[in-house]
Amino acid sequence: MAEKSTLAASSALHLSFPPAASGVFHSRSITAVKVHPVALFSILDHYLRRDVSQPRVIGTLLGTRSESEVEVRNAFAVPHGESQDPWQIHLDAEHHRRMLDLHLRVRPDEVVLGWYSTNTELNSNSALIQDHYSRETAPHQAIHLTLNTNVADEANGLGVQCYVSALLGAMAKPEDCAFLSLPTHLLMSTPEQTALRHLAAPKPQNITDLDALKASLEDVQAKLDRVLTYVRRVLAGEVEGDKAVGRYLSDTIGVVPAGLDESLLESLFQSHLQDVFMVSYLSKLVSAQAEMSTRLVLLT
């Protein structure tokens, strides 16, 4: 599929970006890449299910693109094979196309952004794969995301890094390219942060609804204590106040209706607590009825 990479000697280094279509921002204007945890979990799941003889797994990145940033929201695996003597790569293009069609039926707002690899090494095969995905993302450049799966690497851990590519030389071959690093950030919503915190718990265990509510209240209380400590330190002049934090606190406090006394607030909380218990009771009742119905069917 490809010849061995050869670089001609020259006194100058030419970085050639493919020309962009008129009116379309080029990837050189990208300032950052934001990655959602869902995409990283998909990549790790693919890696754990790989053939042990594979040095790495690859797949397609999906998400949204703006003028200056790309947001990686999803990913799916693409079967492949590769060799180093000579440098060759084989991708299951039909599998890629079928998976992409299925995904776009559910999320038509997402586009192909590039590809991922679970090996941080960038070689000639990486350049060939990058060239393939560049055709998928044209006129934009393809994003290449690498995920370090070496858990023994305490310095970097599961390091995530994104790149774009630039051809070397005026008449360069697809495999003759340089990968240029981009700022990469992990983007998490509040529900995702909560889910990740529970996944990172050392000893997950089954807890009752009341225990879960108690843990949530204790977490809220701890956060309120942190906020009060910060505000008191700012008022005392111990630390310099952050305007962004002040605006956020003001907006948060503004959500609470004004004029609520302690008795009314407690009454509202008790009402909400009763609703929680009622929902929990009804869900257990439905579960018990379903189990009973299943056993009766087996008896008949």
Curated annotation (Swiss-Prot):
The keyword Cytoplasm applies. One of its GO terms (molecular function) is translation initiation factor activity. Residues 33-169 form the MPN domain. It is found in: Cytoplasm. One of its GO terms (biological process) is formation of cytoplasmic translation initiation complex. InterPro entries: eIF3f (IPR027531), EIF3F/CSN6-like_C (IPR024969), JAMM/MPN+_dom (IPR000555), MPN (IPR037518). Its main location: cytoplasm. Keywords: Cytoplasm, Initiation factor, Protein biosynthesis. One of its GO terms (cellular component) is eukaryotic 48S preinitiation complex. Component of the eukaryotic translation initiation factor 3 (eIF-3) complex. Belongs to the eIF-3 subunit F family. PANTHER family: EUKARYOTIC TRANSLATION INITIATION FACTOR 3 SUBUNIT F, EUKARYOTIC TRANSLATION INITIATION FACTOR 3 SUBUNIT F-RELATED. Component of the eukaryotic translation initiation factor 3 (eIF-3) complex, which is involved in protein synthesis of a specialized repertoire of mRNAs and, together with other initiation factors, stimulates binding of mRNA and methionyl-tRNAi to the 40S ribosome. The eIF-3 complex specifically targets and initiates translation of a subset of mRNAs involved in cell proliferation. This is Eukaryotic translation initiation factor 3 subunit F.
